[in-house]
Every structure is written in structure tokens, then in C-alpha cells.
């Protein structure tokens, strides 16, 4: 953050599947939406609340510079990269950028892309729903019938009135890919 008191993990807590469990997020100010969970976010096509971004690195940078979230700046991030040997070395090794010579914007974008690369590694394991979906796709009625009735009611809400599936659609079924 701008004053060094917050990191991404302040709101995207690894112990809570990279979100904070709050109804609304608390950045530098109380925000209007909850903290998005980051597990499986790499499967998304659009990013950020409302889908304003078509890549994963851009909303990461927006959160860093948003005055209500982390209140950082391009210059403060570039300064951190230049003065911290770990970050300086990482940028040089992964982006072939000399942090001492690169302009602030190039360093800032490199950090956004590094964050995005990390986020793409946050992949959940198979869930009960994944097994249910696979059973349906395979036509295995017996296996599909083991999915709990309460979960089926939740699924109806999820894909029906709740309209949750427009943003929370999960990973594609990799078994069906050529």
C-alpha cells in the first residue's frame, strides 16, 4: 500500500481461499463490495467486479493504486522494486528489465504481470460439484443421485434467480478439450 501498512494478503488472505470473509471489503476505506476470492480466477475471461478488465494483471494494478483500496502509486512500487534486492532481481530474471534503468511504468506493469502469473497458480482441487457435473456429462444417473438435495437446491438458486453463474462459472471441463 501507499504507506506500507497493507499487502494484497491483507484482504486476499491465503487462509480464507484468498478472500477475507467479510460482507464488504475494508481497504483504506470500507468498500462497496466484498473481496473477490482469487482461487481459480485464472479461468475467468473478464476480471474485476463488473468485468472491466480483459486480463488478470490490470485489475491487480488498479487495486494497488486505488485510493480507497491500497492507495499506492506507480512511483512507490517502482521505488520498492529498485530498493529491494529480491524484487529487483526477480524483475531482472523474469522480465529482462534492469530495474535501475527501466522507467516506473515498465516496472509497475512487470509487477502486475508477476502478480497475475502467481494468481494463475491458485487452482482448487476437485469438488463435490465437479463430481456431480462429471456424472451428469457422462450420463451416470446413479452417481449424480449422490449429490445432496440441499446442494441441488443451492445449484438451482445459483443458476436461476441468483444469477451467480454469470461471474462464478468455474473451470472448463478439461476432459472435454481436444
Where are these regions (language model features)?
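Periplasmic c-type cytochrome electron-transfer domains
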Residues: 1-178
Amino acid at each position: 500500500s501507499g504507506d506500507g501498512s497493507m499487502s494484497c494478503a491483507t484482504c486476499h488472505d491465503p487462509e480464507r481461499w484468498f478472500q477475507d470473509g467479510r460482507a464488504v471489503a475494508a481497504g483504506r476505506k470500507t468498500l462497496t463490495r466484498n473481496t473477490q476470492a482469487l482461487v481459480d480466477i485464472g479461468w475467468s475471461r473478464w476480471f474485476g467486479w463488473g468485468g472491466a478488465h480483459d486480463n488478470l494483471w490490470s485489475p491487480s494494478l488498479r487495486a494497488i493504486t486505488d485510493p480507497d483500496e491500497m492507495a499506492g502509486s506507480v512511483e512507490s512500487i517502482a521505488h520498492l522494486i529498485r530498493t529491494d534486492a529480491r524484487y529487483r532481481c526477480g524483475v531482472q530474471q523474469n522480465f529482462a528489465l534492469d530495474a535501475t534503468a527501466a522507467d516506473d511504468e515498465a516496472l509497475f506493469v512487470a509487477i502486475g504481470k508477476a502478480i497475475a502469473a502467481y494468481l494463475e497458480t491458485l487452482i482448487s482441487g476437485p469438488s463435490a460439484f465437479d463430481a456431480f457435473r462429471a456424472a451428469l456429462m457422462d450420463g451416470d444417473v446413479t452417481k449424480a443421485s449422490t449429490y445432496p438435495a440441499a446442494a441441488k437446491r443451492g445449484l438451482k438458486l445459483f443458476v436461476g434467480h441468483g444469477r451467480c453463474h454469470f461471474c462464478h462459472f468455474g473451470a472448463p471441463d478439461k476432459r472435454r478439450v481436444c
